[in-house]
Design a protein with these regions (language model features):
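Short hydrophobic alpha-helical segments that form membrane-spanning helices or hydrophobic packing faces
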Residues: 113-119
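An N-terminal alpha-helical hairpin/helix-loop-helix interaction module that forms a charged
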Residues: 1-106, 123-213
Length: 213
């Protein structure tokens, strides 16, 4: 975020409601609804065709840079993740195991994709990690907001447990318990999209095209 951008308003229920209303007005809501239909219709992760469709749909609509859909689908099936996803407690290691895929002897870490894949199965448990949301949270911390504190070596992008902790503390700190993890993701993403658009003209109510991270 640029030093020339105005401060982000302190998060509050009113702020969240405002940005969620903008989200619902635009195309992102329709894309989310379509993906939810896909994931709800195929909740299990033990069939190559079904997992492949979910990987391809998520990758195509959210530009998650998955280059080997079938290979990633086989990788997910081999992890046997359904029992873990059924649990109501976040398992950070699940995100890491989905994220780390071997391609021709080289390991690729599809971190943002893995958080989205878990989120579309369990939006109440697994918050999405992406660059716009990171930018907003980082800007708030630089503004002096105190929703979380960190010890040396803790990083959102390398440890999903830290990311989940920060989102959870963010919700509690600002009195946003009425909103789901997914609602907070939409709010933060819309704030980030708006700030990014301040250098490229007004951001439409739709929030623009599907997120690219």
């Amino acid at each position: 975020m640029s030093a020339f951008l105005p401060p982000i308003p302190t998060p509050s229920p009113d702020q969240v409601r405002k940005y969620l209303a903008r989200w619902r007005e635009g195309d992102n809501e329709k894309i989310d609804a379509a993906l939810q239909i896909v994931f709800h219709a195929m909740p299990r992760n033990d069939d190559l065709g079904e997992v492949g469709v979910k990987v391809a749909a998520l990758n195509g609509l959210y530009s998650t840079n998955i280059f080997g859909v079938v290979q990633v689908a086989r990788h997910i099936i081999a992890l046997d993740i359904d029992a873990i996803l059924a649990d109501n407690i976040v398992v950070p290691d699940l995100v890491e195991r989905i994220a780390n895929v071997d391609f021709g002897g080289k390991r690729r870490r599809n971190y943002s994709f893995a958080t989205k894949y878990c989120n579309f199965h369990r939006p109440d448990v697994y918050p999405i990690y992406d660059s716009l949301v990171v930018g907003v949270l980082s800007a708030l911390l630089k503004q002096g907001e105190k929703f979380d504190t960190f010890t040396p070596g803790e990083h959102w992008g390398t440890d999903y447990a830290i990311w989940h902790r920060s989102i959870s503390r963010f919700r509690t700190h600002y009195g946003l318990d009425e909103y789901s993890m997914r609602d907070l993701d939409k709010y933060l993403w819309m704030v980030g999209k708006e700030r990014k658009g301040m250098f490229a003209g007004p951001v439409p109510a739709s929030g623009g095209s599907p997120r690219v991270v």
